């Protein structure tokens, strides 16, 4: 178990927010990530870190590929929709993922890349997936990206930190509850 003080120290880094998704045998899953990095330039290679316990991981391995959508600052609701602990609601709002060139992509994201996995490495409680970028697209490149840090939460560059109690995630959970689903296990945005 990680020391809470170390967790807080590591959480100070602001990171871009991405949705990592994979499709295999007609099933698509996705999750919010801050742990996707470009590791080579001349040959575009990225690394994604994922928990093998996540329901997207088996699809990534079985398909040998994944797609990363980079979120814009006005896509907080999408980032929170695919984030833990509301993971069991990921698949009741198909408007958040669409298919582009056969890849699961967040509509109107800043850009997206499709990656073919060529190497994996188990490291601690996660698996690092090294992949070549084989397809890409972009949309709103002039928009500010969505960023996240544990200190300030979901933000857009140069924005103030969100006000507690005004979470788009909580609004989404209210929408899910109104549709008749039990959201009691989803927790609160104010936890941690």
Protein language model features and the residues they cover:
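Basic, polyanion-binding surface patches
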Residues: 1-192
């Amino acid at each position: 178990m990680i020391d809470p003080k170390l967790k807080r120290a590591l959480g100070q880094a602001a990171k871009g927010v991405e949705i990592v998704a994979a499709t295999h045998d007609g099933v698509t899953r996705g999750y919010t990530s801050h742990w996707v990095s470009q590791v080579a330039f001349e040959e575009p290679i990225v690394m994604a870190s994922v928990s093998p316990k996540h329901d997207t991981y088996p699809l990534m391995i079985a398909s040998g590929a994944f797609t990363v959508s980079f979120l814009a600052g006005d896509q907080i609701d999408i980032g929170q929709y695919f984030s833990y602990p509301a993971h069991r609601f990921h698949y009741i709002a198909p408007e958040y993922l669409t298919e582009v060139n056969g890849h699961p992509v967040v509509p109107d994201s800043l850009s997206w890349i499709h990656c073919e996995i060529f190497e994996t490495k188990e490291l601690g409680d996660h698996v690092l997936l090294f992949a070549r970028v084989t397809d890409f697209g972009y949309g709103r490149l002039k928009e500010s990206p969505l960023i996240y840090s544990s200190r300030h939460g979901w933000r857009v560059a140069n924005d103030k930190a969100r006000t507690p109690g005004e979470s788009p995630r909580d609004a989404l959970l209210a929408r899910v509850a109104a549709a008749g689903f039990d959201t009691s296990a989803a927790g609160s945005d104010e936890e941690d």
